[in-house]
Amino acid sequence: MNSQLQNNDKMIRTRFAPSPTGFLHIGGARTALFNWLLARRHGGAFLLRIEDTDRARSNPAAVEAILDGLSWMGLDWDGEPVSQFERADRHVEIAHELLARGHAFKCYCTAEETQLLRDEAFAAGRALRSPWRDRDASEARADTPFTIRFKAPDSDVVIEDAVQGQVRWAAKEFDDLILLRSDGTPTYNLAVVVDDHDMEITHIVRGDDHLVNAGRQSQIYDAMEWQRPVFAHVPLIHGQDGKKLSKRHGALGAEAYRDMGYLPEGLRNYLLRLGWSHGDQELFSDADAVAAFDLAGLNKAPARMDLDKLNHINGYHLAQASDDRLCELVTPFLDSLENRIEDINLTTARLKAAMPTLKTRAATLEELADQSYFLLRQRPIQLEGKAAKPLKDDETRQRLYRLFTHLGDLKAWNEAALSDALKQFAEAESVGFGKIGQPLRAALTGGAPAPDLALVMTFIGRDETLDRIKDQMTPATTE
């Protein structure tokens, strides 16, 4: 049976459990995606838990940022998000049950004694073991502060991981894990196990930086006689240079990719392929991804962030998106364009006319806005630098005047008619097409990125085309 199903055939329940200390990091977004896909593939549940036990670092604004990031990415969760902090009483209850079962003990070591023990253990090449694991608590004074520690195992610890295979640690590698601090608050590894058990999580997919934690947590599962979940520890994302992912590699929050103009489906597709494979297939719709995803496809080697590939994949999804949706999504990005028309209805009309072409020429919404600029430029278009050079001499401007007359006489105004008209005019003038195309493009676009000239004129219409040409039939613009 596939390892992802080996959990007594229970309904698959996965979870994403971020700490609310910042935005939805790109690595966390991938973890959430993998868990979401696994649950959706098998008709299970994808749950959300906020691990907010570190009150000093937990930030309500970060919680909102994480929820917003997941929502924007289209990763819907089942039920209400669970607050780990609010479950502290339950964590304490299990710590005392472990104490009663003989799997935990009260440790009365002071901070100074603990540090000394830690130094001695390090020098001996083993993890810390508290002397109180073999002493009776009655030996301590009644008012002495204590922690509750889990008794580290005396034999090797072994887990079966769906990605890493069998992982084994020698007993000496594990210390007597603190379950409850001296102030009575639970620690991470205890809280995680209790929450995952109570939430009936069957599969834990997370970064391999938690692999050692899985070794620790598996001991608590066994001590409580709880069934272990299926573990799947995925290698972390690296930069293109193979080094740990950082901001210079693209280690940003999901909202940063949104603000750069990536589509959620494009980012989902890219993150899916960042550490998971399904043959040679690279492009996935959501339905394709849900149908294909399994733990067997997760790679054991670290994936490398590749912004060029992200742009390629996002460009594909941009081209597949509906024109109406893109017209709406690109609107905020138009604010960066200078000297553009402000008529909203005219802007929308031109965008809708051109969108089937423009969306095949851009990788992001930001690029789509740049590709749209020629449509929206305010007349008269100011020509500067290279854009002005094709219109520097009188002969060119006189030819532009004749072209103005030629185009004005056209009966039909569509791509085919305009393309034929330009060719006929070049033949009549006995010049190469470049002698016509370059100055015409300068007059119509001002040097902004634009498709074929016949399409440009079709998109902006007869009146705007002739007006833009007329604006440049004046003494040559200087730099």
From Swiss-Prot:
ATP binds at K247. GO terms for cellular component: cytosol. GO terms for biological process: glutamyl-tRNA aminoacylation. It is an enzyme of class 6 (ligase). PANTHER family: GLUTAMATE--TRNA LIGASE, GLUTAMATE--TRNA LIGASE, MITOCHONDRIAL-RELATED. Monomer. This is Glutamate--tRNA ligase 2. It comes from Maricaulis maris (strain MCS10) (Caulobacter maris).
